[in-house]
Amino acid sequence: MARYTGPVCKLCRAVGMKLYLKGIRCSSPKCAIERRNFRPGVHGQARQKLSEYAIRLKEKQKARWSYGVLEKQFRRTFSDASRATGNTGAKFLELLERRLDNVVYRLGFATSRAQARQWVNHGHFAVNGRRVSIPSYRVRPGDAITVMPNSAAFVKEALEAASLPQAPKWLEANRETLAATVKALPEREDIDTPVQELLIVEFYSR
């Protein structure tokens, strides 16, 4: 499945909530949800009764669009989670949170996950002193994340522009030196992505 290249604000409207896909614009009055809080399309304002399948599909799409992951990679991540011990849904979200592009976003080093993914692709970040250009790279406790010296200027601009709170407790960030450490694996209560992971488990288990 090809990556979606259309207006990302339509994705937020499709699921009826902010997915924060456009960075600082999502926190401004220009946000599409603030202006047109209904589904895109001719029948967007019509009342709609969703089937059980549609409810689960919507929840899956909400998570996939939030993290900016293609379907094939999203399903592969779910397969990894289902083979692990413990709660499959919580493990699935943990694996998504550990993606390097998501970690860069959580640290406030980028204003959106899409921007973080692009910057990782372009080799602007290093893990344990080695440049990493794979957005899906999974960080582990003890990993040190740094910004490449030539990339510091625009990362600082992103920090100033972003309205993100402090990094989650499983990450330790020094926004002055643009360095961070992964302190632990993320727990379910550390993840604020607004999804019901049980519905995603049910979708892939049908």
Curated annotation (Swiss-Prot):
<dbReference type="InterPro" id="IPR002942">
    <property type="entry name" value="S4_RNA-bd"/>
</dbReference>
<dbReference type="Pfam" id="PF00163">
    <property type="entry name" value="Ribosomal_S4"/>
</dbReference>
<comment type="similarity">
    <text>Belongs to the universal ribosomal protein uS4 family.</text>
</comment>
<dbReference type="GO" id="GO:0015935">
    <property type="term" value="C:small ribosomal subunit"/>
</dbReference>
<dbReference type="GO" id="GO:0006412">
    <property type="term" value="P:translation"/>
</dbReference>
<comment type="subunit">
    <text>Part of the 30S ribosomal subunit. Contacts protein S5. The interaction surface between S4 and S5 is involved in control of translational fidelity.</text>
</comment>
<comment type="function">
    <text>One of the primary rRNA binding proteins, it binds directly to 16S rRNA where it nucleates assembly of the body of the 30S subunit.</text>
</comment>
<dbReference type="InterPro" id="IPR022801">
    <property type="entry name" value="Ribosomal_uS4"/>
</dbReference>
<dbReference type="InterPro" id="IPR036986">
    <property type="entry name" value="S4_RNA-bd_sf"/>
</dbReference>
<keyword id="KW-0699">rRNA-binding</keyword>
<dbReference type="GO" id="GO:0003735">
    <property type="term" value="F:structural constituent of ribosome"/>
</dbReference>
<keyword id="KW-0689">Ribosomal protein</keyword>
<dbReference type="InterPro" id="IPR001912">
    <property type="entry name" value="Ribosomal_uS4_N"/>
</dbReference>
<protein>
    <recommendedName>
        <fullName>Small ribosomal subunit protein uS4</fullName>
    </recommendedName>
</protein>
<keyword id="KW-0687">Ribonucleoprotein</keyword>
<feature type="domain" description="S4 RNA-binding">
    <location>
        <begin position="98"/>
        <end position="176"/>
    </location>
</feature>
<dbReference type="Pfam" id="PF01479">
    <property type="entry name" value="S4"/>
</dbReference>
<dbReference type="GO" id="GO:0042274">
    <property type="term" value="P:ribosomal small subunit biogenesis"/>
</dbReference>
<dbReference type="InterPro" id="IPR005709">
    <property type="entry name" value="Ribosomal_uS4_bac-type"/>
</dbReference>
<dbReference type="GO" id="GO:0019843">
    <property type="term" value="F:rRNA binding"/>
</dbReference>
<keyword id="KW-0694">RNA-binding</keyword>
<comment type="function">
    <text>With S5 and S12 plays an important role in translational accuracy.</text>
</comment>
